């Protein structure tokens, strides 16, 4: 049953995080630079880095609440924060090669798959 609460907390947090990210894109519209998304990515990275060690020490806070904040709210606000936190965790745990490969593979792979998606999506529009 506790897992159900965690799912609900993550879903609600994700909805709020996504809504907050959308609000930032309205406040800071794209004019030569995606300020809203840039702010969400860097702000979310800071928030996840700041809150994770605090939440780990707070044993009185239920796991569902912790996951709702980190995976849900901040993850919904920006997936960049989770990627950055996972990379840092790998490096801190001595997995220098794995962390470095994960970093490079995620960035280059992400860019490559976005480009592939654009190409395939454009083909579908011209047929």
From Swiss-Prot:
Its main location: membrane. The chain crosses the membrane at residues 8-28, 35-55, 71-91, 101-121. Na(+) is not transported, but it plays an essential structural role and its presence is essential for fluoride channel function. One of its GO terms (molecular function) is metal ion binding. The keyword Magnesium does not apply. It comes from the Bacteria. Na(+) binds at residues 75, 78. It is found in: Cell membrane. It catalyses: fluoride(in) = fluoride(out). It is a multi-pass membrane protein. GO terms for biological process: cellular detoxification of fluoride. GO terms for cellular component: plasma membrane. Belongs to the fluoride channel Fluc/FEX (TC 1.A.43) family. Fluoride-specific ion channel. Important for reducing fluoride concentration in the cell, thus reducing its toxicity. This is Fluoride-specific ion channel FluC 1.
